[in-house]
Amino acid sequence: MTQSSKPLEVSRIFPARFDSLADISVFVTQKAEVAGLGPRAVYAVQVAVDEACSNIIEHAYGSEGLAGVRPQPDARAHPAARAPTIECTCRIKRDRLIIQLHDHGRPFDLATVPNPDLEADLSERHAGGLGVYFIRQLMDAVQFESVPGQGNTLTLIKCRTPPDLGVNSGPEAA
């Protein structure tokens, strides 16, 4: 794969609906492959983005009922933005893929979600929370920012590693 020193950046706006998840997956999969990620890392990106977008639809937009959605300031400028949307931006740098998911729903900071107690008996575990745990485990970095009037941005970063290493390839995986 030949890459210039300039990062490649591509954005696409999707309706914030569960039936958009397949299209979002195709979009990020193509960018992950162009970024040179190995098959396991591509799969990790697919799972993390699917879970993150599901969380945006469910929590930021109140499922597809869209309860409590903030008006989008650019709705007149962009007809596609009138309905709740998820803007997916993929930025390919020399050694990583950066995915930003931007929405105008209620803020939902993944940092406020504690890791689940995986050792606890199933009857003692809280419902939910595993998706956020998977996102954290599958990606190399996860950041969240909410700016009033501008929306929420979830940034997911996956670094390129040799294809023979596992999804979470660090010194312990070698």
Per-region residue spans from a language model:
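Short, structured helix-loop boundary elements
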Residues: 18-21, 42, 46, 83, ...
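Helix-loop-beta hinge of the Bergerat
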Residues: 5-39
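Conserved beta-strand-loop-beta-strand hairpin that lines the nucleotide-binding pocket
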Residues: 1-11, 56-174
